[in-house]
A protein has these predicted regions:
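Amphipathic alpha-helical "stalk" segments
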Residues: 1-140
Length: 140
């Protein structure tokens, strides 16, 4: 298997993991067409674009730790965090999504222990709540 084939297989496995973990719930909430379009966007990413997406995800966790130290969701660091997160979501959803859908997704993080665990384990207890507050602040 060459590098390109290995990369395509890795993307397919990543999407399968997403579908196995969140697929049913995501399809019920956002519809098949939306999830299929997101999956198509992910499969169309080049290796460099995929790596940039992964680096952005890691950078969001670092920025969350930095911003959380301010304890101010309106701080410059928190607003940068919000911008980075929105950019990361746009990679998955594409541009032109509705602000209310994005804010609904983010608010949903607080109701889902998987997301709370993900963000809190990356940046400390209360990180998910802080992320949500920072994003809401950026959208006032």
């Amino acid at each position: 298997m060459d590098v390109k084939d290995a990369f395509e297989k890795m993307k397919e496995e990543g999407l399968k993991t997403f579908e196995d973990t969140y697929g049913k719930e995501a399809r019920e909430r956002y519809g098949d067409a939306t999830i299929d379009a997101s999956n198509e966007r992910m499969m169309a990413l080049t290796k460099d674009e995929w790596e940039a997406k992964e680096l952005l995800e890691d950078a969001i966790k670092v920025q969350l730790r930095i911003a959380l130290q301010t304890q101010d969701p309106q701080s410059e660091a928190a607003q940068e965090l919000a911008h980075m997160h929105e950019k990361w979501i746009a990679i998955h959803w594409g541009n032109g999504y509705k602000e209310q859908a994005y804010l609904g997704l983010v608010q949903g993080y607080l109701n889902d222990p998987r997301f709370v665990s993900y963000y809190d384990s990356a940046a400390g207890e209360g990180a998910t709540e802080f992320l949500v507050q920072a994003i809401k602040s950026a959208h006032k």
